């Protein structure tokens, strides 16, 4: 069979088209891979910072042997957990036992979809961004409850129940605070919320317009992250390790990862909702606007936005780490009373007050 020149060119064009499709497919997943790499690095930095700050508060030496200044200690711990034996409970539900950590990790990772780290640097600028985060974050306690129930251990089961009760108690005040911010910004999009704060400069940040909501959001975020003084689901003195008691190896490492991912997500949302996101309200912004047509300056602006966002997030991280070594753990009844009898009425009153001001200003 003889193939003429036209057929050869047609075959080559189809081959090039398929090759282009593969290249476009790789390019489309590049932002996701970049974000995952950035999240991994951020978690390692947070673990190192927590150990160094905790050591400084307790007047002792922190990690110093694994790498320079102990920077590789988190990698060493993760590698150790990776090669540990994966022990399964003999009388537990093995399928639920294995699925629980995965649900918790995936639900937290999905929250990064709607977080704008910088100007035009967000994976999904959705019109319901903040509500999507609240909905996704409500899935994580289901994974913790599954982990506790499937372990066939009383300590694990109690820890799972505590995690579910704590999440339900503090999710509602958190939602009311987000609703108040959305009313001020006239949008549920995280990008629109940041841009609404940038209109009035530094004093347009929602921390000044919603101080009560900020405090409620801060406390509720710490409770959602299960940080001291709200770490009742894994209280060592009462429940050994809570829902993590029967876990070992990589599954235990996933729960360890979830706690720091939760802390990172909460810090970023505090920054986006109350601290102006990537905006700093200093003269360099007008300088970048003047040279907006330059692509290099646009990349520099995006990089500066990411740096500013992360710097503000680290402020919240420092506060949460300091609180861990400052306040004692609460009892379960105190935790529930704080959520239902104190934070819920305050957040509801703040929402009604914000709604009234918005109606009057129309």
Swiss-Prot record:
GO terms for cellular component: chloroplast thylakoid membrane. Its main location: plastid. Pfam families: NADHdh. Its EC number is 7.1.1.-. Keywords: Chloroplast, Membrane, NAD, NADP, Plastid, Plastoquinone, Quinone, Thylakoid, Translocase, Transmembrane, Transmembrane helix. It is a multi-pass membrane protein. NCBIfam families: PRK06076.1-2. NDH is composed of at least 16 different subunits, 5 of which are encoded in the nucleus. Belongs to the complex I subunit 1 family. This is NAD(P)H-quinone oxidoreductase subunit 1, chloroplastic. It comes from Triticum aestivum.
């Amino acid at each position: 069979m003889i193939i003429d020149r036209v057929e050869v060119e047609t075959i080559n064009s189809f081959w090039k088209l398929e090759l282009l499709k593969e290249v476009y497919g790789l390019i489309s997943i590049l932002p996701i891979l970049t974000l995952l790499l950035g999240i991994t690095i951020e978690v390692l930095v947070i673990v190192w910072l927590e150990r160094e700050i905790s050591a400084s508060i307790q007047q002792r030496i922190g990690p110093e042997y694994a790498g320079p200044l102990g920077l590789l200690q988190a990698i060493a711990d993760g590698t150790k957990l990776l090669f540990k034996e994966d022990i399964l409970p003999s009388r537990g539900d093995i399928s639920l036992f294995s699925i629980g950590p995965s649900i918790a990790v995936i639900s937290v990772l999905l929250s990064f979809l709607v977080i704008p780290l910088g100007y035009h640097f967000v994976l999904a600028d959705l019109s319901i961004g903040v509500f999507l985060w609240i909905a996704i974050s409500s899935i994580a306690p289901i994974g913790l409850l599954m982990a506790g129930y499937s372990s066939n251990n009383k300590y694990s089961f109690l820890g799972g129940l505590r995690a579910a009760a704590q999440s339900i108690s503090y999710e509602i005040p958190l939602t009311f605070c987000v609703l108040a911010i959305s009313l001020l910004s006239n949008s549920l999009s995280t990008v629109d919320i940041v841009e609404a704060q940038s209109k009035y400069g530094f004093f347009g940040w929602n921390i000044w317009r919603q101080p009560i909501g900020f405090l409620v959001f801060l406390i509720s975020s710490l409770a959602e992250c299960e940080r001291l003084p709200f770490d009742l689901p894994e209280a060592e003195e009462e429940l050994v390790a809570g829902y993590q008691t029967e876990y070992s190896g990589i599954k235990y490492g996933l729960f360890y990862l979830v706690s720091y991912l939760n802390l990172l997500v909460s810090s970023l949302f505090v920054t986006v909702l109350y601290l102006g996101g990537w905006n700093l309200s200093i003269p360099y912004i007008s300088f970048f606007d003047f040279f907006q047509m330059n692509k290099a300056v646009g990349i520099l602006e995006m990089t500066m936005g990411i740096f500013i966002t992360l710097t503000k997030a680290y402020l919240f991280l420092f506060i949460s780490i300091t609180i861990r070594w400052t306040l004692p753990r609460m009892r379960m009844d105190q935790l529930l009373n704080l959520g239902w009898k104190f934070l819920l009425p305050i957040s509801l009153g703040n929402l009604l007050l914000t709604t009234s001001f918005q109606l009057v200003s129309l």
